[in-house]
UniProtKB/Swiss-Prot annotation:
This is UDP-N-acetylglucosamine 1-carboxyvinyltransferase 1. GO terms for biological process: cell division; cell wall organization; peptidoglycan biosynthetic process; regulation of cell shape; UDP-N-acetylgalactosamine biosynthetic process. The active site is at C117. Pathway: Cell wall biogenesis; peptidoglycan biosynthesis. Cell wall formation. Adds enolpyruvyl to UDP-N-acetylglucosamine. CDD domains: UdpNAET.
Amino acid sequence: MEKIIVRGGNKLHGSVKVEGAKNAVLPVIAASILAERGASIIEEVPSLTDVYTMKEVLANLNVGVEYENGRFAVRADRPLKTEAPFEYVRKMRASFLVMGPLLARVGRARIALPGGCAIGSRPIEQHLKGFEAMGATVEIGNGFIEARIDGKLQGTKIYLDFPSVGATENIMMAAVLAEGTTIIENVAEEPEIVDLANYLNAMGAKVRGAGTGVIRIDGVDALQGAVHSVIPDRIEAGTFMVAAAITGGNVFVEGAIAEHMRPLVAKMREMGVDIIEEEAGLRVIGPEQLKAVDIKTMPHPGFPTDMQAQMMALLLRAEGTSVVTETVFENRFMHVEEFRRMNGNIKIEGRSAIVSGPTSLQGAEVGATDLRAGAALVLAGLVADGYTRVTELKHLDRGYVNLTEKLKALGADIERVEEHQENESLEAAELI
């Protein structure tokens, strides 16, 4: 079993390049199924376990896939299989995103009930509601969801009860080949939605309104392969921004797009962090003393839930009391117990966490309960007294490429080791 060992105390300096966005690339890969002719070339694809899982899902559907050096090539101009089995889908909820494209392209999809991070209920009813509104028959049983349509899906008006990112993406992909016009209201407005719409339009789709609360899609007869470069990962960028701020460092985050991160930039500036917007990215300079702020996660353009845990690590170092309210997922405070193991002073009251700081964090052995919690614990380790050991790295590898190496290049005292190598690593560190 691997673990990350961090010794706190070093300020981070230098430059770090952000990878392509995990939450953008997965739906884009799924959308490639829609192309009846030609190859799709997707660039800036991060080397993540979720990407490899999606590659396996597509290969199992008889889609031709190649992935090398950040470039993903897809050919779906062949007879497609229609079942995504549990062995793949259980690893990652985003596998469910192939349902919309399969339903639109071949009229049938049988997908195992999805897996992924255990951070509360993320119901798929919104996806299915959209498919049914477009004329599909949906059945759930024996661990599978099966959707069928005789003929083509029909354009219609769909209202989402909640602006779910996954439901917005899945319904968008189904609607591009539907007969007539589909209008989706109360949709997600994330930058990743805009990125998917740009890719679909490059394939020949007619999608308008992405990035607003209403998306209008005029169905077309067929799509073809296209070339697309994935947007930078705003959550990875945000994680490195917090790393710079929490250590009092000075880091240039190459590829960070301020327009995609306005809530985070605003809150960090409110805490006293100096953030300079440059043409190629953002420079982040941490202050001597951070100020407490309140944070409430919301669908975009509100504060992103995927940055809640990392910001909580930063708030532990701030002067005063901060309140973090989680409104998107009902079970996303599992990292609080791990912070407490590091001497974090946090109380839970319903959907809010009350953070009292500044806390003198202490190194401890902690577990990554989910993807973003893992990153947050590494961030806390950067300023903790002594050694912090972060385990359960399988979650971390789903969303970060070479996190340890990138932090080390910025000056962090950090190693990723096998359990049997830990003593050797610590002994070597003591000699330096």
